[in-house]
């Protein structure tokens, strides 16, 4: 799906949709970093501020969002169609044993963003090895993995409450430290 589905419109989707029960804004944007910062991270940070009056996560998260470009040096990003919420609970098999993916939150984005739910997906080394035989592994992939998990931790914080806040805050703090911000 990632290799064969490129977008001429840029990053986004022709309609907004949802990620779980949270609205997911998909306005077309020509730059991936701008799209991810504004429509994924900043949107979720605003929800956290509105729902929980959480100014700490909002301010620190905003600082990270303004500096995302530092994590994408020498990275070529082509928009490809993403499932958007890929984890073990959204994968099943039909009666013939063929895989079926459920409950998509589709948009065109950076292929690495697909792994944002890896913390509950059960993807092991064999999965990643097979994937990167087909798709080129970009420089800095390991350093960006948590960045894509952050979106989903923030979304879970907004949907399910404070149990997910510490994971999101830890990722933000780690990136602020890594980037000397």
Residue map of PLM features:
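A cross-family kinase active-site recognition segment
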Residues: 1-54, 78-79
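Active-site Asp-x-Gly
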Residues: 24-37, 46, 75-81, 88-146, ...
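A ubiquitous structural signal for well-ordered alpha-helices
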Residues: 44, 64-67, 153, 171
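Short, glycine- and charge-enriched coil/turn segments that flank and shape catalytic ligand pockets
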Residues: 51-56, 94-97
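Short, conserved active-site entrance elements at the starts or edges of catalytic domains
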Residues: 55-68
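Generic structural signal for well-ordered alpha-helical scaffold segments
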Residues: 65, 69-73, 132
